[in-house]
Amino acid sequence: MRTGEVAEAVPRVVAILSSLLQRVAERNDAAAAAAAVGEEAAAVSAFQGLTKPAISIGGYLERIFRFANCSPSCYVVAYIYLDRFLRRRPALAVDSFNVHRLLITSVLTAVKFVDDICYNNAYFARVGGISLMEMNYLEVDFLFGIAFDLNVTPAAFASYCAVLQSEMTYLEQPPAVDLPRLHCCPSDQDDAGCHHKQQQQQQQQQQHQLAV
């Protein structure tokens, strides 16, 4: 991919996901500061950093896109995996100290499951600005965190696409009340919990819109 084409080639899902995670991280940063639990939160997970990375969430996602060559679907699947991980670890809140590591690890996991061709962990470690040892450790911790539940049904994919589309609406016209949660369905593994209208035809339409 040529450098001059990167800005136009970045899929919409990257900007939408970065906006969603930015709001969630800022809200949790404020909550942690108000509760004065910074030191306690740092010990919750291996994903927790000691300092906030200088690069923004949006810049970090664009860097991943630029160098990892992920398909747009990977970012939706990474979002699903991240939600599954957080459901199983309710004590962990996405904030500015852990969101970058969570992102690079969830995208790495999604790429390996979704795309036919992907770079190895050493490459992703360089893209993410961490060591190979840390990348390997985070990947294993993440996989155990989601109980190796990597399968994503069409209904679940469509449901999370719908959430990202809602975020796109938020960007265009912010609602009076901020969207409070990162995830959408009570259980994305339960097809009965996802509406039939979000089946394969809608999935194809949503995937096209997010890739534009």
Swiss-Prot record:
Superkingdom in the source lineage: Eukaryota
Gene Ontology BP, a term: cell division
Keywords: Cell cycle, Cell division, Cyclin
Keyword field contains Transmembrane: no
Keyword Cell cycle assigned: yes
GO function terms (MF aspect): protein kinase binding
Disulfide bond entries: none
Family statement drawn from the similarity comment of this UniProt entry: Belongs to the cyclin family. Cyclin U/P subfamily.
Protein known as: Cyclin-P4-1
Phylogenetic lineage: Eukaryota, Viridiplantae, Streptophyta, Embryophyta, Tracheophyta
Gene name of this polypeptide: CYCP4-1
